[in-house]
C-alpha cells in the first residue's frame, strides 16, 4: 500500500511543478488558465501516449498519429512560493494551495472560492490490490452530472457507479450498471452557490465512482474515484458555469462533428426493426 500522508519540496520544472510526498511524486500542469492537470505517478513512469487528448502541453508518443486533430499549447504562466507548511502556485485565474502535513491539494478561483479540496489521508493512495484511489471534498448541496451512458436519475449524488462497459442488452433503465459506454468525466454543481467544476480522470482502465454514498465521520463528506490500473491523472476544469466547463472539456478531448440532417430526430435502431408486427 501507498498513502500520501506528508508533502515535501515543490519544484518549478518549467512546464510543470513537481510535488514530493512520502509515497509518490505528483506533477501539476497549468494547461490553460482554467484547466489544471494533477497526476500522481505511482509507477514512476511518466510516459505520455494518450489517444483521448486533442490539446496538450507536453510531448506524447501519439503526437504523429494525432497530428491532424491535436493542438500543442504552452503551459499557462504561474508563480510558485514554497514554504515549510504549504506551497502556493498562483496562476492568472486559478490558485493551487498544497498543504504538507497532512498532505492535500486545494484549488481556488480568482475570487477566492474553493473549487476543489483533497481529503487528507484518502486523496492519493494505492490499496493492497494495487488500485489507485482519489478522494475529493464535497458538500450536501452538490449535484453530479456526466459519467457517460448511465441508467437512473441524472443527478448521481449518493450513487455508486461501476465503469466497466459490456453488452447490457435488455437493461433496467433505472438500476442497471454499467452500460455500454463510460466516460470518467463529471461536473459537480453546487445548488446553493450555482458554481460548477469539471473532473476528467484521464484513464481507460475499469474504475468506479462513489459520489458521497459512503460516509465516515472521521473525514469531511467526500466522493472517491478508484481505478484498477494506471495513474490518478486528473484534469480539473474551472467554470463557473456548466456551459463553460463543457466548452473547455471539449477543447481538451475534442468537439463533436455536426450530424447530417437525416440523423436528427427520432432514431430507430436495428434492434427494433424486427419487432413491429406490421
Residue ranges and their predicted role:
Residues 1-266:
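N-terminal accessory segment at the very beginning of proteins
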Residues 271-277:
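Conserved small/polar residues in nucleotide/adenosyl-binding loops
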Amino acid at each position: 500500500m501507498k498513502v500520501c500522508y506528508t508533502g515535501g519540496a515543490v519544484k518549478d520544472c518549467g512546464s510543470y511543478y513537481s510535488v514530493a510526498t512520502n509515497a509518490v511524486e505528483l506533477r501539476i500542469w497549468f494547461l490553460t488558465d482554467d484547466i489544471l492537470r494533477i497526476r500522481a505517478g505511482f509507477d514512476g513512469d511518466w510516459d505520455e501516449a494518450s489517444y483521448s487528448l486533442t490539446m496538450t502541453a507536453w510531448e506524447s508518443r501519439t503526437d504523429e498519429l494525432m497530428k491532424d486533430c491535436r493542438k500543442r499549447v504552452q503551459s499557462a504562466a504561474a508563480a510558485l512560493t514554497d514554504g515549510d507548511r504549504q506551497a502556493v502556485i498562483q496562476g492568472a485565474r486559478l490558485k493551487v494551495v498544497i498543504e504538507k502535513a497532512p498532505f492535500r491539494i486545494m484549488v481556488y478561483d480568482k475570487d477566492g472560492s474553493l473549487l476543489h479540496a483533497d481529503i487528507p489521508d484518502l486523496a492519493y493512495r494505492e490499496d493492497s490490490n494495487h488500485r489507485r484511489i482519489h478522494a475529493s471534498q464535497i458538500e450536501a448541496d452538490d449535484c453530479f452530472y456526466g459519467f457517460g451512458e448511465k441508467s437512473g436519475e441524472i443527478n448521481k449524488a449518493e450513487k455508486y457507479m461501476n465503469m466497466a462497459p459490456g453488452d447490457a442488452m435488455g437493461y433496467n433503465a433505472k438500476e442497471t450498471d454499467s452500460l455500454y459506454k463510460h466516460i470518467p468525466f463529471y461536473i459537480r454543481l453546487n445548488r446553493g452557490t450555482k458554481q460548477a467544476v469539471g473532473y476528467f480522470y484521464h484513464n481507460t482502465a475499469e474504475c468506479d465512482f462513489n459520489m458521497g454514498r459512503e460516509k465516515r465521520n472521521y473525514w469531511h463528506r467526500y466522493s472517491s474515484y478508484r481505478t484498477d490500473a494506471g495513474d490518478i491523472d486528473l484534469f480539473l476544469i474551472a467554470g463557473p458555469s456548466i456551459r463553460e466547463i463543457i466548452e473547455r472539456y471539449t477543447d481538451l478531448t475534442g468537439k463533436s462533428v455536426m450530424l447530417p440532417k437525416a440523423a436528427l430526430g427520432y432514431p430507430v435502431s436495428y434492434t427494433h426493426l424486427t419487432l413491429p408486427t406490421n
